[in-house]
Amino acid sequence: MVIHKNSIIHQDAKISSNVEIGPYVVIGPNVKISENVIVHSHVNISGDTTIGDGCKIFPFASIGNDPQDLKYKGEKTKLIIGKHNIIREYVTINPGTDGGGGITRIGNNCLFMISSHIAHDCKIGNNVIIANNVPIGGHGIIEDDVIIGGNAAVHQFARVGKMAMIGGMTGVTTDVIPYGLSLGNRNYLEGINLIGLRRKNIPNKYILELTSAYKEIFKTNNLNENLNELNGEFKDNTLVNDIIEFINKDKKRPICTPFIK
């Protein structure tokens, strides 16, 4: 363990071996940091915060400080960050609130670029990339393998399905389906995230079926009727099933649909 002499670490904080902590870091009493974590200078970590193995936290990040929610009155809530995440300069990640289940949860192998913000009660999956200056509003759900471009913004309670891609400067006010490509302010569906699917080596057969199903699902604004008309046509395609399940889940925001020109 290497802790710079100019850092302030509360005696009750649980710091594992093989952790490196740079100068002018402040760590509170209820913080738990796992093995092989690197905390660069001028980082503040507070609250009931758990940080998993191998994370790297860069200068001026603020982790676990009180939620930006006027209803929050100091309740004991949590922030749980998984393994091997990279948290760049000026990133802010807030813990949960009683109104949202009390936990903000970050998965594994994510990249949070400079000045991105994860608000209270968010659920971030694995292998997510959130680019510079992107705020995720409270209670937001970002599933696995999502990429969100710079200066986009995600509305509170909005969901972004797995392997979706959000273009830079997009205002996400509606739920984006798995494998979707969403652009614009306010956001609309541009189509399927073909680049992301090919990067994951998804067989072309499944991509073609997904594209056909996408056209059927969004051929009119009546999604329920369109889903019923599929009548199990793509029941063996897990990609299509992911979209159907996503649309049918309980939701706070409407589903993002294609732009009607």
Model-inferred region functions:
Residues 2-188:
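Structural signal for interior beta-strand "rungs" in well-ordered beta-sheet cores
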Residues 1-6, 11-12, 17-18, 54, ...:
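Terminal amphipathic alpha-helical/low-complexity segments used for targeting or macromolecular assembly
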